[in-house]
Amino acid sequence: MTIGLLGFGVVGRGVYEIIASRQDMKIAQICCLEDPSLPDVRVTRDFQTIVQDETIDTVVEAMGGLHPAYEFVRAAMEAGKNIVTSNKALVAAFYDDLIPLAREKGLKFRCTAAVGGGIGWLSELERAHRVQTICRVRGIMNGTCNYILDSMTRLGLGYDQALKQAQALGYAEARPATDVEGIDTWHKAILSSNIAFGVSLDREQVPV
């Protein structure tokens, strides 16, 4: 497998380190704003060099956000490249566009890491959906909220105190809005429902 990597932040660097230890795959190009000076890897700021590289069969999107991640991913798919992403916001927002395109092109679109990556949540939902009818999906979708609510309920902490404790322990970001305002759970619930029930929910249909 020959990979084009989009983004070289925390996620992108982690992907690079994992793949660098593998013999069955390699990163041919990385598209990012700053040159990380890596051996044996071409670094570019022009995404089109990855799209036009015929040796690259898979693009790993590690940019985050919706734009330009969506435009880059779609262009890569139009060029016949498989996609791997952990970007739950991207997949939730454009599920009914990207998944049909992958089927039309005969491509693999892998987004298991977007929700419960460590337990293979989405891949298990996908397998279950193929062989039986799923009636309900439920679970703890956000670890930050789970910790805060547990601390408030079980320990009697106030919200502000529980949040500060979660931040001190590294469970919550310094800017926790995506977690505590339900956005992260929103994306995960939409994506899980789309796969479990074979539907195409979007952010307009599911209020938060």
Predicted regions and their residues:
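General beta-strand structural signal in soluble alpha/beta enzymes
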Residues: V43-T44, E61, V84-S86, F109-A113, ...
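Rossmann-fold NAD(P)-binding glycine/threonine-rich loop
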Residues: Y70-A75, A79, S86-R127
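Oxidoreductase and adenylate-handling cofactor-binding alpha/beta cores
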Residues: I119-I134, C145-D160, H187-L201
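NAD(P)-binding Rossmann-fold cofactor-contacting core
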Residues: S21-P39
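NAD(P)-dependent dehydrogenases' Rossmann-like dinucleotide-binding region
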Residues: I134-C145, P207
